[in-house]
Amino acid sequence: MMDKELLEAALAARERAYAPYSKFLVGAAVRAESGKIYTGCNIENASYGLTVCAERNALFNAVGAGERKFTALCVVGDTEEPISPCGACRQVMAEFKVPCIILANLKGDVKEYTLEELLPYGFTL
């Protein structure tokens, strides 16, 4: 079931994105098992490899606050179809076993996936 509060938090986070190079603003919000929502936005850098995606930013904010278990993550961007996370973000979601991933665009299109649907053969140790 769509988590409207999580989507609204991701939309608000998107407004704080720092994307002077691509102009591609992305927001994400993750709900911890505690119920608390943590947000993140993409933050670009002139040295492109140092750019941090919104999804990882949100998860790292939560982990930095002591959270380790999550129920859902939502990411939103201005794309034709609901935005799709990059491979690095999918692997970080796998590290923290995020069970429900909600992808959305600004037109109101929303799709929900399980982690296994987005990353069926993620790397594990």
Region annotations inferred by a language model:
Residues 41, 50-56, 60, 81-95:
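Local cysteine-cluster metal-coordination motifs and their immediate loop/turn environment
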Residues 1, 38-39:
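Polybasic, low-complexity association/targeting segments
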Residues 45-46, 118:
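A short acidic/small-residue loop/turn micro-motif
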Residues 53-74:
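Short, solvent-exposed cationic patches
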